Amino acid sequence: MNIETNLKTLIVKNPLKLDCGKTIKDFPIAYETYGSLNSQKDNAILVFHALTGDQYVSGTNPVTKKDGWWSYAVGPGKAIDTNKYFVICSNVIGGCMGSYGPSDLDSENGNIQGTNFPVITINDMVNAQYNLLDHFGIDKLFSVAGGSMGGMQVLQFISNFPDKSKTVIPIATTSSHSAQNIAFNELGRQAIMADSNWKEGDYSSNNSNPGKGLAVARMAAHITYLSKKGLQEKFGRKLQERDDLKFGFDADFQIESYLRYQGSVFVDRFDANSYLYITRAMDYFDLTKQFKGNLSDAFKDTKAKFFIISFTSDWLYPTQENKDIVIALNSIGADVGFVEIETDKGHDSFLLEVPDFLNTLKNFLDKSYEEH
């Protein structure tokens, strides 16, 4: 399901060798921009999206007709002020919103690639997106920013291109995917692949869609984005439009109905194979391993200013995993700031209207811009 909209698309002509050993070329990267690039071309912020995000950071998403996924943070006068900054965000390769992914046709046989699409990594995503800098003639970004998988891309970007951003903002992220998170992703993948409509990844050619499996994958993942306290306060044991239990398997509880809804609407906007590929890329991410066990070496060549943000109730990428990045940066004398935001909204806090987070982000950017 490659959703067609009025896409801004860059066709990357240069061959890109992937970590799996395969090479791709003449491939599309779908992107969106907000604000204006100044004459010095030094006010650009490259935003990286999370697992189920896309290039539509702000404004209205033309597919869902809802606000962009980071509308609380990006826009005129907001934390990432588009009156001041030129914001770029692209759909990652492997995605389903216009960038090169498993729904694209194979250039050799004309068939939808499905699981013949090459396995990609966070490193591959970042190297593909780097082409946007050349496209806009940007020598150095003002900032790179992103949460969750977006934060992984932020870390990979500054490791790969140490002199290409003045500031670096990884949010609610990690330097390597834990066993717990690999387990949750595998649960989602198995739900998709167990759906009889998956057809070994060839469902598009068979006019089918593994929507039930994808919905379950989304439901399971969505739980990890929340917190126990937040769930209890919002739902508790409240019943869904009924006065008593029905002694069946319909959604008796509000939380059941909520998760089913999250699964059903997700199927309308996301592709099952893309979910497989992107979660696999997240699981393969291990910046420490790339540098033979020394995370500090990933950042030793950069003079960028880091600002790392975590949330108290995030159990998907807990504060300690963010602090490990801070420790690695401190060990090489890097310019690094860190803040832990108190909130009960869980991992998804970076996507929500959390005033302390938004004010902290805005203050860091504004101060850095004044110094700049």
Segments predicted by a language model, with ranges:
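N-terminal cap/lid subdomain of alpha/beta-hydrolase-fold enzymes
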Residues: 32, 37-106
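Catalytic active-site module of serine/aspartate enzymes centered on a nucleophile-bearing elbow/loop
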Residues: 324, 330-372
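Cap/lid segment of the alpha/beta-hydrolase catalytic domain
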Residues: 66-67, 78-135, 182, 186-204
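Alpha/beta-hydrolase-fold enzymes
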Residues: 170-265
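Short beta-strand/loop motif that positions the catalytic acidic residue
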Residues: 302, 308-310
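Catalytic-loop region of hydrolases
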Residues: 1-47
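Short glycine-enriched nucleophile-adjacent loop
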Residues: 151-162, 168
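Short alpha-helix in the alpha/beta-hydrolase fold that links the catalytic acid
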Residues: 291-295, 318-329
